[in-house]
Amino acid sequence: YGYSRHAKALPLYTRRDAQRAIARIVPLPPGRDALCGSVRIGFTPVGHLLGACAITLLHGGERLVFSGDVGRSNDLLMPAPQQVPDADVLLVESTYGNRAHPKDDAAAQLAQIVSDTVQRGGSVLMPAFAVGRAQALMLMLQRLKAAGQVPTELPVYLDSPMAVQATALYHKHRRLLRIPAREAEHLA
């Protein structure tokens, strides 16, 4: 932070560097390996967000597995994480590593809060991460309306350009979600 060898900090890479790197990208679907020099590479879906995978690198008989966030087996939108291969070295993100997720019924809590607030004539404002959490909240509200647990005429607005774009991606790739197609249609 604040350190550079240059009087005016220079970017780490140029637009041309980025374009050259993008031109070299080769899609590799989960479950299929590829060889890059002497390193075998593979991806395993981890159920966190659309496309989230652990990467496995195999070189000289040693296996390294790296993953960012790993999803939960009972996630509302995403399928459960797949088992990653055994590893000699495992690197994994650990924001919630020392916490157990509460087993509370989030939908029931949300229904109660929304219903109580609407009865008082109030509005509900729910800040949420634009990718993943916003889509899960939209689905939960959709299900609560369908079940009559919150007023069906309750307007719901997604007021974040990034969340709207992410929701469009979730809809486009709805086959990767764990929800039925009819529910995924409402994500658009």
Model-identified regions with their sequence ranges:
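Short, conserved secondary-structure transition motifs
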Residues: 133, 151, 155-172
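His/Asp/Glu-rich metal-coordinating catalytic cores
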Residues: 1-136, 142-149
